[in-house]
Amino acid sequence: MSNKFVITWDNMQMYTRQLAEKLLPADQWKGIIAVSRGGLVPAAILARELNIRHVDTVCISSYDHDHQREMKVLKQADGDGEGFIVIDDLVDTGGTAELIRAMYPKAKFVTVCAKPAGKHFIDDYVVDIAQDTWIEQPWDMAVTFVDPISKK
C-alpha cells in the first residue's frame, strides 16, 4: 500500500471520543472487549468516556506491521458479547472482523477507522479510509528530529 493515513495521539483520542458519543447511554453496556493490540488504546479511552470498569480482551494475531497473515486466536473473552462493546482500531479486509463477529454475535462491534471491504462486519465507526491506504497508528511511531529541507 503506497498511500498512508497517519493518526496522531490527539486524533486517536478525538476520534474515539466521537465513537463514545455514538454509544450513549453508557449504562446499557456491561463492559468492553478490546481486540488486542489495536483495540487496546481505543478501549481505554472508551472505558474512561463511558465510565465502564469491566474491560476484557480478545487476542488475535493477524498482522506483522504492514503485512496480513493467518489469524490465530491467542485468548478470548467469555460469552457471546451480549451487553458488550467490542472495539478495534480498524476494519480492513474484514478477516479479523468476520472472526470477531462469529465469536461475539450479540456484541456491538465498533472500530475507529473502516475501509470499504470490511465495513459490513461492524456496527459503527468514525473515520472512512480508502482500501488502498495503510493506517499508521500513534503507537507505531515516534517523534524524531528531521533535518531542514534547506540547510544554510
Swiss-Prot record:
What's one GO MF term for it?
A: hypoxanthine phosphoribosyltransferase activity
Residues that bind Mg(2+), according to the entry? 89
Where, in this chain's numbering, is 5-phospho-alpha-D-ribose 1-diphosphate bound? 37-38, 69, 88-96
EC category: transferase
Quote the record's binding site residues for xanthine: 92, 135
As for subcellular location, the record says:
Cell inner membrane
**Keyword vocabulary terms for this entry:** Cell inner membrane, Cell membrane, Glycosyltransferase, Magnesium, Membrane, Metal-binding, Purine salvage, Transferase
Q: Which CDD domains match?
A: PRTases_typeI
What is one process in the GO biological process aspect for this record?
A: XMP salvage
Which cofactor(s) are needed, names only? Answer: Mg(2+)
* Catalytic function, reaction form: GMP + diphosphate = guanine + 5-phospho-alpha-D-ribose 1-diphosphate; XMP + diphosphate = xanthine + 5-phospho-alpha-D-ribose 1-diphosphate; IMP + diphosphate = hypoxanthine + 5-phospho-alpha-D-ribose 1-diphosphate
NCBIfam families xrefs: PRK09177.1 (NF006613)
Q: Describe the function of this protein.
A: Purine salvage pathway enzyme that catalyzes the transfer of the ribosyl-5-phosphate group from 5-phospho-alpha-D-ribose 1-diphosphate (PRPP) to the N9 position of the 6-oxopurines guanine and xanthine to form the corresponding ribonucleotides GMP (guanosine 5'-monophosphate) and XMP (xanthosine 5'-monophosphate), with the release of PPi. To a lesser extent, also acts on hypoxanthine.
- Could you say which protein family the record assigns here? Belongs to the purine/pyrimidine phosphoribosyltransferase family. XGPT subfamily.
Protein name (record): Xanthine-guanine phosphoribosyltransferase
* Originating organism: Photobacterium profundum (strain SS9)
